[in-house]
Amino acid sequence: MSTGLTPPPQPIKRPPKAVTWIFAIIALIILIAPMSVGFYTDWLWFGEVDFRGVFSKVIVTRIVLFVIFALIAGFVTWLAGYFVTKLRPDEMSAFDTQSPVYQYRQMIENSLRRVMVLIPIFVALLAGLIGQRSWRTVQMWMNGQSFGVSDQQFGHDYGFYAFDLPMLRLVTDSLSMMLIVAFLIALVGHYLMGGIRAGNQMTGQKSFVSRGARTQLAVTAGLWMLVKVAGYWLDRYDLLTKENSTFTGASYTDINAQLPAKIILLVIALFVAIAFFSAIFLKDLRIPGLAVVLMLLSSVIIGAAWPLMLERFSVQPNRAEKEAEYISRNIESTRYAYGITDEDVTYEENWGAGETTNEEVAADSATISNIRLLDPQILSPTFTQQQQLRNFYGFPDQLAMDRFEVDGELRDFVVAARELDPNALQQNQQDWINRHTVYTHGNGFIAAQANQVDEVARDVGSTRGGYPVYTVSDLQSNARAAESEDAEQLGIKVDEPRVYYGPLIASATDGADYAIVGDTGDGPVEYDTDTSSYTYEGAGGVDIGNMVNRAMFALRYQEMNMLLSDRVGSESKILFERDPRSRVEKVAPWLTTDSKTYPTVIDGRIKWIVDGYTTLDSLPYSTRTSLTEATQDAVMPDGTPQPLITDKVGYIRNSVKAVVDAYDGTVELYEFDTEDPVLKAWRGVFPDTVKDESEISDELRAHLRYPEDLFKVQRDMLSKYHVDDSGTFFTNDAFWSVPGDPTAAEGRQELKQPPYYVVAADPETGESSFQLITPFRGLQREYLSAHMSASSDPNTYGEITVRVLPTDSVTQGPKQAQDAMMSSDQVAQDQTLWRGSNDLHNGNLLTLPVGGGEILYVEPIYSQRKDQASAFPKLLRVLVFYKGQVGYAPTIAEALSQVGIDPKAAQDIEEVDGTTTTPSTDETDTDTDQPATETPTAPVSEAEGIAAINDALSNLEAARDGSFEEYGRALDALDRAVDSYQSAQ
């Protein structure tokens, strides 16, 4: 029988605690799983490269710091909350019960235990996560070294600023932040718990601070002021790294106003701390209040107004004299910090002031015979088309430079490893099995002598000539006696030409650069050559033969095929982290690596050489620089692409040379600066990870280069810090600048010209030397002011020479030389004619000191057909600029002769018919605007012409299935046959 009454709603049942715990555990696993997978696979990887000690030291240090910061921050937070609850009023007034915060007090008291746990845990976790990031600072402090150099103001060794001061700052900043959090908890907590009450005139409520609240807030504030006292003491040292408008370091105002102000404020802060502590015993808060007002007024008057007045009325009218001492300090410290002291740099003042004859220039065979014609920034497509072999091989966009001996003479070479390019795989090659188990490695080492090409290319339309002369060591050439002998004579014969590690291999756009290798029981499956397959036999790689490891990597790369594919067996390994630079950065997380890595051949194996830098954020009076900005140029408009420990540095050394084996990925770190205290500190942190400098083999040392990024940083510094006199430095009159690159693409010509590796005469001995060079122009002027070179030769490595040109005469700079060359009548005429069907590329504009006193500019011109998808750049012409004259010809010898330099030392280049061209100044017109003319084709009969055309067409058809080079030669033969036939009509 219905009563007409609605039954009461059923209460919502809470899920059982077990279900709640299950969901919580699942959520925790989801959060922790990715981190655990990364941790485990990295642990395996570090074991594979034999650097697990680095991994363990970093992890343990970070965990310890996490625990220390978490415990201290959690305890301070808990203690603040504990005193809030302990010191809260026992009774509430009528005003308190009517307060809107009363309900919050009730909520807090009802869940007091939970609040007292959750808030400290949250703060502890946050502090731990922040604190563990400072592992480098802590380890550097624990292993600090002496520099043997002291600052000019306080007399402390630089080691104090490099290792101790950052640690002291970490401690004071951390304590300061923790005390601020504790103060806020006390303030808010006492307000909610009734210990602090704001007054209200409308209700007649008076403000109120309980004794407990006053005591807790006063003690916390007093402790914070004591930390501030320590902060003021450390602030004195920070003045030495302060950046001013003219220089870095403490200025006259800083030393005579800011420094005394810090001491005075320190004393006042100490009195303020005492005033806060007095509030424990005094009910009157006016004493701490007055102390705070005194502190604020002192900060404004003593800390700001006094230095400002001294700056305005004493320093500004006499800045050059007042700042002279401090500018001198800045010059001295900056030179030391960047390795450009007088011990590191040799200045040749008034270089070229005397008369240098053309005969002396021609006799400079070390430079003239090594003039570089191949531009590694342009020729990557040429290498790719002529040496690619298969579509899945490739070369980096920017090739590298190295040097080798040819017939006892040092020559520079464009070098590259033929790597696997994962982004070039065709659609049918991109399934998981092909990509990760078949196409796993590259093949071979390629070198092309930089001062010669195969043949002279006189005709822009010809497909012959103007291409590099390659020496190759790969699987195919090793099987051919003649090519193998050529490689062996050059010193690049590779016993193991397979390339499993390299920057191009690691450039997969999806980040999956791994390869699965090893014996699967079904025989070799990796592509090796068209007629053979291969099974990886190297020591590199992480074992994934067991299901645990396999599952972990399947999770890391989110790839089920690792678990399901038959290509993964009990003997399988996974190769990953295949970029040489990333491998070095991972095993040496304290290094900043150079943006360029390059391959070479050491002991019959392809090795990648990576330059490593030790850096510091700052040193006293040392000018800081941005590594990103300093490395920007026309080739790298965005600066170094490498991850940086810190972008702005005040100290840098190329302390480590790293070598990565291209076959098994082995990483070797070698000490290279035996005097660097920062490296010594890191070797203390990670013992037995860096080999002694004495262990560098002679073969490896012969291929070490002066690193580009360091050179760029040093040239930026030398543009200012070559100046000795503080007065001259202050006026900027003698500053230099790096010229823009006039050969760069439109929009980049104002960017700095990159430095170039060349083989040229050693500044002291005149012998052939492998150098990194760059010109300087005057500040806001285009005329050449100086020329800088750094030696890479084993006996003189790192010696920097700066040739300073006379100031009473002018020498055209790179832009002026480029303008003169490109405005030459014949050059302009040819460019206009050729651009219709060709893309013309201006190669590197080399600024070469020659003959002991003259400057020679050399620039190769490359052409590339527009109407051919497979076209690639070739050397077409060579431009030279010398003493206001322009040389323009298909060969460097002809171009030199046009400007009056006997080219007897220049490299001979074969003509198409097999002859060589080496004109002398007696045989060649030196008129700079006269183009070279082609040898006329001998006339033939009509029947012979038709027969020759038919033969050429047959050869062209037969060459369609051959290489691009064979097809190009067939096209060229057809062109010659047509020309011969037309000349007979």
Swiss-Prot record:
Skewed-composition ranges (Low complexity): 929-939
Chief place of localization: membrane
One Gene Ontology term, aspect cellular component: plasma membrane
Segments crossing the lipid bilayer: 19-39, 63-83, 115-135, 176-196, 215-235, 262-282, 290-310
Region of interest (Disordered), residue spans: 906-944
Membrane topology note: Multi-pass membrane protein
Keyword terms, alphabetized: Cell membrane, Membrane, Transmembrane, Transmembrane helix
Pfam families per the UniProt record, alphabetical: UPF0182 (PF03699)
Cellular location(s): Cell membrane
Coiled-coil ranges from the UniProt annotation: none
Family of this protein: Belongs to the UPF0182 family.
NCBIfam families the UniProt entry points to: PRK00068.1
Name of this chain's protein: UPF0182 protein cgR_0895
Species of provenance: Corynebacterium glutamicum (strain R)
